[in-house]
Regions:
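Bacterial lipoprotein signal-peptidase II cleavage site
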Residues: 28-43
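Short, well-ordered beta-strand elements
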Residues: 48-62, 80-85, 172-176, 285
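Short helix-initiation/N-cap motifs at beta->coil->alpha
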Residues: 58-61, 81-95, 200-211
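Short, polar/charged alpha-helical segment
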Residues: 61-80, 190
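An extracytoplasmic/periplasmic, membrane-proximal ligand-sensing/linker region
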Residues: 62, 182-198, 202-219, 280, ...
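Ligand-binding pocket segment of bilobal, Venus flytrap-like solute-binding proteins
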Residues: 95, 101-108, 174-252
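A conserved helix-loop-strand patch within extracytoplasmic ligand-binding domains
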Residues: 122-175
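A bilobed periplasmic-binding-protein/Venus flytrap-type ligand-binding module shared by bacterial periplasmic
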Residues: 136-146, 263-277, 300-301
Length: 329
């Protein structure tokens, strides 16, 4: 994590046109687990000072890119102390009520969690779109789509099921998913489309990427869950399998889903208390917006070029001053 900066003059200049310069009336929690409003946390003040900003980081590199850039700007421009917290998706939402999480930067739909935490518990509020379009689906390596072009139609998958068998798929074709915490309807899809496949979890985004990379290099049969935005698609342009078209409401019952995933307008979720705190970090989160291409570039810096998240963020921020300045207006 970058060092907490106290350059008040620089911070004030960047925030000059920002809304929400009101006093920070809420004390945020630190890593030690102090509750929201607790005396242990060290923020506060009477001039919109940032204090501690608790940022959830979900387990995929695109989100890591979001968090890297927002954290860098919060520290360099606003003088915040950013506490990044590596959390699975639903665990992060639980943190809104305890004061352990202020913001989630990339929410993929999750209408169920919005109902629970925004509508029912009222511990969270929506903070607008990220600008990213999220696509989830089933993919095969390019070589496979080229040699068997009909494989990109789900109706033909069973014809090739035996080719996808592995030691973990129990005599059925393997459908490889990533982290079990990701948004997925795949088990229901396999069941409801009556496919001779079994969902097997790679365990992480890194493992899923490596499986596709190896499948392309060694011409191995692989059908797997994947998504955009994702830098890896510029390295290996996976071919998407066409599932039954998505229609509004076709995924309303999770057990009966038999359609493709929707295109998600990814959005930001923050704690209700954070939204009303007057913290300039909230204004930054609310105004933060970029494209799939922006995210993929920073993610590539981290995953491929092996830059630290801080260095990757610094490189992108310095190359895109216009976009960054817009977040402070």
């Amino acid at each position: 994590m970058a060092t907490h900066l106290t350059a008040a003059g620089r911070s004030a200049r960047w925030r000059a046109g920002a809304a929400g310069a009101a006093a920070l009336g809420l004390v945020l929690t630190g890593c030690g687990g102090a509750k929201v409003g607790g005396s242990e946390a060290g923020s506060g003040g009477s001039s919109g000072k940032c204090g501690t900003f608790n940022l959830a980081v979900n387990p995929w590199v695109g989100y890591e890119a979001d968090a890297a850039v927002v954290a860098y700007v919060a520290e360099e421009k606003l003088g915040c102390t950013v506490k990044k917290k590596d959390l699975k998706e639903e665990i992060a939402w639980q943190g809104f009520g305890t004061g352990e999480v202020d913001a989630i930067l990339e929410n993929w739909g999750h209408d169920d969690l919005k109902k629970k935490y925004v509508e029912q518990q009222k511990t969270a509020v929506e903070a607008g779109p990220t600008g990213n379009k999220g696509v989830i689906g089933w993919y095969v390596p390019p070589w496979l789509a080229k040699e068997h072009p009909d494989i990109t139609d789900w109706k033909n998958l069973d014809k090739y099921a035996d080719k996808f068998r592995t030691s973990e798929s129990g005599g059925k074709g393997q459908l490889l998913d990533g982290d079990p915490s990701y948004v997925t309807n795949d088990a229901a899809l396999v069941k409801n489309l009556k496919l001779d496949f079994k969902v097997v979890y790679a365990g992480s985004e890194t493992a899923l990427i490596q499986a596709f990379r190896q499948a392309e290099a060694k011409k191995q049969w692989l059908l797997g869950y994947f998504y955009e935005p994702q830098w890896f698609l510029s390295e290996v342009p996976l071919a998407k399998v066409e599932l039954p078209p998505y229609e509004a409401g076709c995924d309303a019952d999770a057990e009966k889903v038999a359609c493709d995933y929707p295109v998600y307008d990814l959005d930001k979720i923050v704690s209700k208390k954070f939204a009303g705190s007057g913290s300039p970090a909230y204004d930054l989160v609310k105004n933060f917006s970029w494209t799939n291409e922006d995210q993929n570039l920073v993610a590539k810096y981290i995953a491929v070029d092996k830059m630290s998240p801080e260095a990757a963020a610094e490189k992108w921020v310095k190359a895109n001053p216009g976009k960054v300045d817009a977040w402070g207006k």
